[in-house]
A protein has these predicted regions:
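N-terminal glycine-rich anion-binding loops that anchor highly charged ligand groups
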Residues: 45-53
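Conserved S-adenosyl-L-methionine
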Residues: 222-233
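SAM/dcSAM-binding transferase cores
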Residues: 2-46, 237-295
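A general beta-strand register signal
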Residues: 58-59
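Short gly/ser/thr-rich secondary-structure transition/capping motifs
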Residues: 38, 145-148, 228
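The AdoMet/dcAdoMet-binding core of the Class I SAM-like
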Residues: 2-13, 17, 65-196, 205-212, ...
Length: 295
């Protein structure tokens, strides 16, 4: 006897990044519990729980993170650039309204942290329904949060930040402007001479369509540009997801696990015990690419 059960479409969340088109696997999550469904000034917001993934946030029909694997995304995008820089003092995250990047960044002995987020309602929703993601980071006294367009904000700064994390949504809706050439120019103008930036890009299946072209744009500003690999089981890519690391002066490939381990112990001390995914070995392995994905 078959265990297959036919369910109503209303009981499922089906991700539709490209309407009517699926280049990756079909992502359908059973909605076991509706938490919140609404619309901000900028985007649709959906919070629900799904068996095996826990609580999930979707914006404009696209999964942003799930409770089961958000730590992978946030630890990689925060610690890889911060650990690559020898003396980071000022840190900026563009986007990241859920607070996950900040949760990881505040573990470092930074002098100042900044966040610019266009959608204040997303921050409020995440504080209410996903307090475990920010982990109290919004209360850090070193942090300044600004609600405005990321490009407008970053244009105010020159040679100021050692590390910038661009944790934007995908290249649709409010995040579209953060995938254009003018924005990249602004990012590198805001970085110090030895500054490092990392950008959320997408699945490696988009390598030829998106990732390779963005790497070319970044090479106009940074001496070292390299993809960063990470697994994201809750994303439509299935597993292989891509960030892009861009460094003006420091070669990320020359950092050994020994050097990274020393920095980790010195900077995070006992806080390193809270890490679930990042390690010096993971750091180094995340930069290793097959030939087809090298830029």
């Amino acid at each position: 006897m078959s265990d297959t059960v036919c369910l109503k479409r209303s009981e499922w969340f089906v991700e539709t990044f490209f309407p009517g088109i699926r280049r990756c696997k079909l992502d359908a999550f059973r909605i076991d519990k509706e938490i919140f469904k609404g619309k901000s000034k900028y985007q649709d917001i959906h919070v629900f729980e799904s068996r095996g993934f826990g609580r999930i946030l979707a914006l404009d029909g696209i999964i942003q993170f799930s409770q089961s694997d958000e730590f992978i995304y946030h630890e990689v995008i925060a610690h890889i650039p911060l650990m690559t820089h020898p003396h980071p003092r000022r840190f900026l995250v563009v986007g990241g309204g859920d607070g996950g990047v900040l949760r990881e960044a505040v573990k470092h002995p930074l002098k100042e942290l900044y966040q610019v987020e266009i959608d204040q309602e997303v921050v409020g929703i995440c504080k209410k329904y996903f307090p475990f993601v920010s982990g109290g980071a919004f209360l850090d006294k070193r942090l300044r949060v600004c609600f405005e367009d990321g490009k407008n904000f970053i244009n105010k700064y020159k040679n100021f930040f050692e590390v910038i994390v661009v944790d934007s949504t995908d290249p649709v809706g409010p995040g579209k402007a953060l995938f254009q050439g003018g924005f990249y120019t602004s990012v590198f103008n805001a970085l110090t001479n030895d500054g490092i930036a990392i950008f959320q890009l997408g699945p490696f299946i988009d390598f030829g369509l998106i990732i390779k072209s963005i790497a070319k744009k970044l090479k106009a500003h940074a001496r070292f540009v390299c993809p960063v690999r990470l697994p994201m089981p809750s994303y439509s890519c299935g597993s292989e997801y891509c960030f892009m690391l861009a460094s003006k002066k420091i070669d990320p490939a020359k950092l050994t696990p020994g050097i990274l381990g020393q920095r980790l112990a010195l900077r995070l001390k006992h806080k390193a015990n809270s890490l679930k995914y990042y390690s010096p070995q993971i750091h180094q392995a995340s930069l290793v690419m097959p030939k087809i994905w090298r830029v």
